[in-house]
Curated annotation (Swiss-Prot):
ATP binds at residues 264-266, 351-354. One of its GO terms (biological process) is selenocysteine biosynthetic process. Keywords: Aminoacyl-tRNA synthetase, ATP-binding, Cytoplasm, Ligase, Nucleotide-binding, Protein biosynthesis. The keyword Ligase applies. Pathway: Aminoacyl-tRNA biosynthesis; selenocysteinyl-tRNA(Sec) biosynthesis; L-seryl-tRNA(Sec) from L-serine and tRNA(Sec): step 1/1. HAMAP family: Ser_tRNA_synth_type1. Its main location: cytoplasm. This is Serine--tRNA ligase. GO terms for molecular function: ATP binding; serine-tRNA ligase activity. Belongs to the class-II aminoacyl-tRNA synthetase family. Type-1 seryl-tRNA synthetase subfamily. Catalyzes the attachment of serine to tRNA(Ser). Is also able to aminoacylate tRNA(Sec) with serine, to form the misacylated tRNA L-seryl-tRNA(Sec), which will be further converted into selenocysteinyl-tRNA(Sec). It is found in: Cytoplasm.
Length: 426
């Protein structure tokens, strides 16, 4: 969440910056709550001073043998008024906190201003899309030829937006995940983690999915116990490992990676990408998370993005990098790069990774801090996350970019060690 002090002292500046994201901040409501808060706080402080003075008078009156009953009654009355004032203050603060939980992060000054994905800025491209001298098939048709992708069987089990993978295609999917994990742990310095796929509400609030995006989540209600949610990304479980911690400066940067299934309701995706594996309720992803000193987070974002790019480069898949505009960034991001891989059947680039610097937005929600050696005081860390990569979409890209005229698939060179000698999937 945003810094409440910044919201109070720079309210209009914050509102103007949020407006570039298409978010309308209710300035009047916040000003009204802040005025009430100040008024009640001033009143309670004055009352506390009066109560302290009256309490002192009781001792003096008692020493003189005077009747202290009226003074005692006054002190008791003031104590009751103070309790009421505290309750009122707590209520006002709860309202302000509830508002804060719905406000997105402030975009960095380097983020291009724009209203939608149409105004994202291309930063660079890598590789050249292949030309085919035969009619291109999409990954669904290629999966049917090898009997490796079965959407009908998945629908029988679970309904729409699921897939069953078989044989060499299932092995290729596993190979991709293993390759990604090995690359990030072996060359990029991440520590592999295995985390729960079910989390409770505080974890999702910590990374920003709750309360605003509950409809995008799969919830498991339990009578008499805290609800569970299926993770929409390992960002939730990995980032929350530092919740409530004060981290020694020598431990930073912390670089974590995990391969997990991800679960999303796709509540706002009705009618989009209904064919194939591009948009599913359950998909695998290799997620990278970094926890860093605030002064180093923008540099870390460039490194995180490069780590994701390296996967595509080694797979020899053409891609481009976009700097997302203010109106297209995720809720918790200060700055985001999207990686889009070339999908031949669609004749366009499709998102395969999103790499974001969240600044201290998540850290403030989680109270994740580091001890600054210069001040000796705990300060909020900065957190970053990025897909390295979405495994299902990478599988789609490999199937389509490595297809041959007869519908067979060449196995990328870098994946052959994971495929037990299989070089072509038929």
């Amino acid at each position: 969440m945003l810094d409440s002090k910044q919201l109070r002292t720079e309210l209009q500046v914050v509102a103007d910056r949020l407006a570039t994201r298409g978010f309308s901040l209710d300035v009047a409501r916040i000003e009204s709550l802040e005025e009430r808060r100040k008024s009640v706080q001033t009143r309670t402080e004055q009352l506390q001073a009066e109560r302290n003075a009256r309490s002192k008078s009781i001792g003096q009156a008692k020493a003189k043998g005077e009747d202290i009953a009226p003074l005692m009654a006054d002190v008791e009355r003031m104590a009751n008024e103070l309790a009421e004032g505290k309750t009122e203050l707590d209520g006002i603060q709860a309202e302000l906190d509830a508002i804060l939980l719905t406000i997105p992060n402030l975009p960095d000054a380097s983020v291009p201003v724009g209203a939608s994905e149409e105004e994202n800025v291309e930063v660079r491209r890598w590789g050249t899309p292949a030309t085919f001298d035969f009619e291109i098939k999409d990954h669904v048709a290629l999966g049917e030829i090898s009997r490796g992708l079965d959407f009908e069987a998945a629908a029988k089990l679970s309904g729409a937006r699921f897939a069953v993978l078989r044989g060499p295609i299932a092995r290729l999917h596993r190979a991709l995940a293993q390759f990604m994990i090995n690359l990030h742990t072996g060359e990029h310095g991440y520590e592999e983690h295995y985390t729960p796929y079910l989390v409770q509400a505080p974890a999702l609030q910590g990374t920003g999915q709750l309360p605003k995006f509950e409809e995008d989540l799969f919830k498991i209600s339990r009578e008499g116990e805290a609800d569970f949610y299926l993770i929409p990304t390992a960002e939730v479980s990995l980032t929350n490992l530092v919740a409530g911690e004060i981290i020694d400066a020598k431990q930073l940067p912390i670089k974590l990676v995990a391969h997990t299934p991800c679960f999303r309701s796709e509540a706002g995706a009705s009618g989009r990408d209904t064919r194939g594996m591009i948009r599913q309720h359950q998909f695998d992803k290799v997620e990278m998370v970094q926890v860093v000193e605030p002064s180093k987070s923008m540099e870390a974002l460039e490194g995180l993005t490069a780590n994701a790019e390296r996967v595509l480069q080694l797979l020899e898949l053409p891609y481009r990098v976009l700097a997302l505009c203010t109106g297209d960034m995720g809720f918790g991001a200060v700055k985001t790069y999207d990686l889009e891989v070339w999908v031949p059947s669609q004749d366009k680039y499709r998102e395969i990774s999103s790499c974001s610097n969240c600044g201290d937005f998540q850290a403030r929600r989680m109270q994740a801090r580091w001890r600054n050696p210069e001040t000796g005081k705990p300060e909020l860390v900065h957190t970053l996350n990025g897909s390295g990569l979405a495994v299902g979409r990478t599988l789609v890209a490999v199937l389509e970019n490595y297809q041959q005229a007869d519908g067979s698939i060449r196995v990328p060179e870098v994946l052959k060690p994971y495929m037990g000698g299989v070089e072509v999937i038929r």
